[in-house]
């Protein structure tokens, strides 16, 4: 699908996200069944999560604590009084034929989240605030496995696994403040950073721990009324969120340009075709016939409880980014990269605490170590090079004991085997040559051995300076102090 640029500039996209975050509690939201993802099908079930007659649910307090902590992290208003409701619908993976959720009195309302948008070319960071309508608690449904296809259409039969039934979820509903696929993907990533920093979820989209539904409409620029809203499901990565939105924006613009109707419907993103396809007519809240859950009492959060949970909050990603910029003098981009993962941020801070320069450590973590982790598909907690050893390596460069080139040469061995950089440098005899007399002697010998190059240099071919510097580096095995070598070569060649 292609759309002319002039048509794109006539319209703007109005986008909101509904994000479901699966919590990492040991037991389900209303019963004691395990939430283990890898268990065999239909083994983590009981009469409560299967909805047998006469059973009574009991709220897992950890779910409430997680909801309040995330509510505080998104700058929301925590309700002192809220309740659960029954959301009624029929589907094969919902054994009770209703889902316990929250409707008109959610646990959190009126929040916001600041996102950062990175220009890929300049690495410049701009910030935007996205409103959050509400956050509420609910139970997950089961899971259908379609044999012979990844969708119901085309499958020979379907199997149902109720292990996921009753697993606790937090649903976070944004305001329609997003305007592009990039903004939506970044918003979802910032939510994932929050839940990981809080330790309440692993935020793994591939395993369904974080699921995003997109609501999107198009309207002419300047128009206040919203267009017809379309929901998009089935996106299991941040890039899929961005691509699905970009496709849907083009599809809706093309429909408007051709005077074709846009229907209020739910559409699925198909990764294989890179398209959205119609799934069903979109339901409204009245279709679910919500009413208060009679088997659960209302929830009351006391001021004392709220203060207790506030004190348990860690330093959050946005706070850490601001501190890195102010305390360490890092760019907004480097601060963002370092704080994307809490373990990476902790590693970085430990290396700086060992006495190394904050900016130099940032360069090593975001470039060389990040490349090693990416190439070997490792988390930073899995490498044997301790942050203290990285700090020691950086300090060897700062003091002139070794050059940056030598540091890069020994880094692979340190990453594979660990140990002390100082001891490794001494063992290999790789200490940087910074002695003036020793370097002068080497340079004199090289100039004497290359009279033709010297004559050409003095005749105007000044780029031959690099030849002489290269010969010094070659003769010393890269151990010559680069700055001092350049200065001395300049002096000798001009003399």
UniProtKB/Swiss-Prot annotation:
Catalytic activity: L-glutamyl-tRNA(Gln) + L-glutamine + ATP + H2O = L-glutaminyl-tRNA(Gln) + L-glutamate + ADP + phosphate + H(+); L-aspartyl-tRNA(Asn) + L-glutamine + ATP + H2O = L-asparaginyl-tRNA(Asn) + L-glutamate + ADP + phosphate + 2 H(+)
Any Pfam family hit: GatB_N
Keyword Electron transport (UniProt): no
Enzyme type, top EC level: ligase
Biological process per Gene Ontology, one example term: translation
Alphabetical UniProt keywords: ATP-binding, Ligase, Nucleotide-binding, Protein biosynthesis
Gene Ontology molecular functions: asparaginyl-tRNA synthase (glutamine-hydrolyzing) activity; ATP binding; glutaminyl-tRNA synthase (glutamine-hydrolyzing) activity
E.C. designation(s): 6.3.5.-
Subunit structure: Heterotrimer of A, B and C subunits.
NCBIfam families noted in UniProt: gatB, PRK05477.1-2, PRK05477.1-4
Stated role: Allows the formation of correctly charged Asn-tRNA(Asn) or Gln-tRNA(Gln) through the transamidation of misacylated Asp-tRNA(Asn) or Glu-tRNA(Gln) in organisms which lack either or both of asparaginyl-tRNA or glutaminyl-tRNA synthetases. The reaction takes place in the presence of glutamine and ATP through an activated phospho-Asp-tRNA(Asn) or phospho-Glu-tRNA(Gln).
Record family assignment: Belongs to the GatB/GatE family. GatB subfamily.
Protein name per UniProt: Aspartyl/glutamyl-tRNA(Asn/Gln) amidotransferase subunit B
Lineage of producing organism: Bacteria, Bacillati, Cyanobacteriota, Cyanophyceae, Oscillatoriophycideae
């Amino acid at each position: 699908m292609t759309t002319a640029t002039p048509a794109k500039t006539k319209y703007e996209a109005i986008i909101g996200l509904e994000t479901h975050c699966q919590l990492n509690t040991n037991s389900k939201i209303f019963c004691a069944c395990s939430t283990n993802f890898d268990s065999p099908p239909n083994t983590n079930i009981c009469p409560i999560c299967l909805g047998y007659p006469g059973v009574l649910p009991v709220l897992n307090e950890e779910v409430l604590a997680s909801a309040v902590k995330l509510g505080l992290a998104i700058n929301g208003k925590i309700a002192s009084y809220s309740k659960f409701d029954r959301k009624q619908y029929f589907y094969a993976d919902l054994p009770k034929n209703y889902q316990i959720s929250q409707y008109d009195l959610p646990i959190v309302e009126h929040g916001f989240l600041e996102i950062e948008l990175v220009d890929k070319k300049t690495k410049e960071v701009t910030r935007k605030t996205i409103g959050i309508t509400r956050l509420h608690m609910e139970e997950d449904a089961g899971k259908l496995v379609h044999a012979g296809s990844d969708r119901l259409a085309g499958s020979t039969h379907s199997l149902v696994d109720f292990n996921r039934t009753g697993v606790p979820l937090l649903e976070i509903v944004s305001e329609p403040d997003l305007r592009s696929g990039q903004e939506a993907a970044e918003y979802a990533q910032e939510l994932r950073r929050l839940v990981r920093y809080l330790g309440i979820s692993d935020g793994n989209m591939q395993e369904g721990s974080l699921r995003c539904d997109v609501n999107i409409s198009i309207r002419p620029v300047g128009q206040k009324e919203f267009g017809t809203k379309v929901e998009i499901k089935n996106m299991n990565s941040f890039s899929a969120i961005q691509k699905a939105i970009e496709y849907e924006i083009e599809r809706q613009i093309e429909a408007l340009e051709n005077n074709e109707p846009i229907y209020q419907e739910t559409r699925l993103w198909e990764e294989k075709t890179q398209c959205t396809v119609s799934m069903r007519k979109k339901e409204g809240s009245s279709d679910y016939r919500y009413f208060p859950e009679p088997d659960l009492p209302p929830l009351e959060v006391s001021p004392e409880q709220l203060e207790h949970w506030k004190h348990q909050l860690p330093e959050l990603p946005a706070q850490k980014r601001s501190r890195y910029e102010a305390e360490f003098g890092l760019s907004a981009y480097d601060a963002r990269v370092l704080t994307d993962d809490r373990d990476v941020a902790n590693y970085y801070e430990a290396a700086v605490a060992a006495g190394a320069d904050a900016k130099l450590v940032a360069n090593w973590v975001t470039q060389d170590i990040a490349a090693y982790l990416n190439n070997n598909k490792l988390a930073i907690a899995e490498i044997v090079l301790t942050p203290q050893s990285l700090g020691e390596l950086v300090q060897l460069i700062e003091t002139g004991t070794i050059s940056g080139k030598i540091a890069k040469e020994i880094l692979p061995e340190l990453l594979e085997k660990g140990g002390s950089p100082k001891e490794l440098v001494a063992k290999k005899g790789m200490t940087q040559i910074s002695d003036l007399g020793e370097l002068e002697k080497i340079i004199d010998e090289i100039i004497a051995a290359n009279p033709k190059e010297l004559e050409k240099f003095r005749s105007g071919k000044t780029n031959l300076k690099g030849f002489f510097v290269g010969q010094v580096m070659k003769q010393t095995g890269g151990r010559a102090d680069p700055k001092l070598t350049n200065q001395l070569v300049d002096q000798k060649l001009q003399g």
